[in-house]
Amino acid sequence: MIVVTGGAGFIGSNLVKQLNAQGRTDIVVIDDLTDGTKFVNLVDLTIADYMDKDEFQARIVSGDEFEEWDDGIEVIFHEGACSATTEWNGKFIMEVNYEYSKDLFHYCIEREIPFIYASSAATYGGRNDNFIEDPKFEQPLNVYGYSKQLFDQYVRRWMPEINSQVVGLKYFNVYGPREQHKGSMASVAFHLNTQVKQGDNPKLFEGCDGFPDGGQMRDFIYVDDVCKVNLWFWQNPQHSGIFNCGTGRAEPFQNVAEAVIKHHQQGAIEYIPFPDHLKGRYQSFTQADMTRLRGVGYDGEFKTVAEGVADYMAWLNRA
């Protein structure tokens, strides 16, 4: 069985979709459906089983071998987390993102099960120079980023003793289908689309940190491309480590807004004051250093903002 934690969430459900496209349906989704709206991400997918994340964690900790699943667990894609960068309940974040990840990690390395997990570019924080997979370049701005940083550090300490595949992927700004349940944490493309559909102009922040209005830049990566990287590592088990998962290109938020406007053929960008609560806690620039990912042989192409947002708009506004 293939296990996808967070499988009803944004990246997890897209990963299940790509696995289905490869003919794999022996998939167990692990998630927390307290927010029942996430079920819509699964209705067009084929899976073998679903399990609540708390039950799964309890069975993992107890050393359960999941004999009801044929041949046990083949791989764990660990996409489940509290991904809200605005969540400041540190106890909750550390339990869900750090402790849970450690439990899965130890279960996998003890049984030599491939373990591919979601890290985050939030570990880099407000740096605007080096986005290289090295602790000296990490300075997270929020407790979410810290929880991801700490788990990366934990994995790095264990790596010399591990005989099976362990891969951490530092996701940059991911956008695309099946993120509607994320509310305020959904991508800028999602929110701008909603604004234009409601007859409003798409709104971007005024300039800050030396960037012009709408000119703050991020490494935006389409969710399909993120899933392809995950699956490539699983198919290349000789590679382990922590890798950036971005495009290597920083593009301004203005490019996202222009792609949304182009799809709808209406609207003009409006600039709004930069929120006080984000000052000093905002990444005005991110750009993945792709040296390590390319160095292990990943040669897939990444959509530009214009290409990816066009695909996403077609999906969001389908009849």
Curated annotation (Swiss-Prot):
Chain sites annotated for binding substrate: N173, S184, H191, F205, E206, G207, C208, R218, Y282
CC cofactor: NADP(+)
GO biological process: ADP-L-glycero-beta-D-manno-heptose biosynthetic process; carbohydrate metabolic process
Keyword Isomerase (UniProt): yes
Keywords in alphabetical order: Carbohydrate metabolism, Isomerase, NADP
Protein origin, superkingdom: Bacteria
InterPro entries: Epimerase_deHydtase, Heptose_epim, NAD(P)-bd_dom_sf
GO molecular function: ADP-glyceromanno-heptose 6-epimerase activity; NADP binding
Pathway: Nucleotide-sugar biosynthesis; ADP-L-glycero-beta-D-manno-heptose biosynthesis; ADP-L-glycero-beta-D-manno-heptose from D-glycero-beta-D-manno-heptose 7-phosphate: step 4/4
Name this polypeptide is given: ADP-L-glycero-D-manno-heptose-6-epimerase
Taxon lineage: Bacteria, Pseudomonadati, Pseudomonadota, Gammaproteobacteria, Aeromonadales
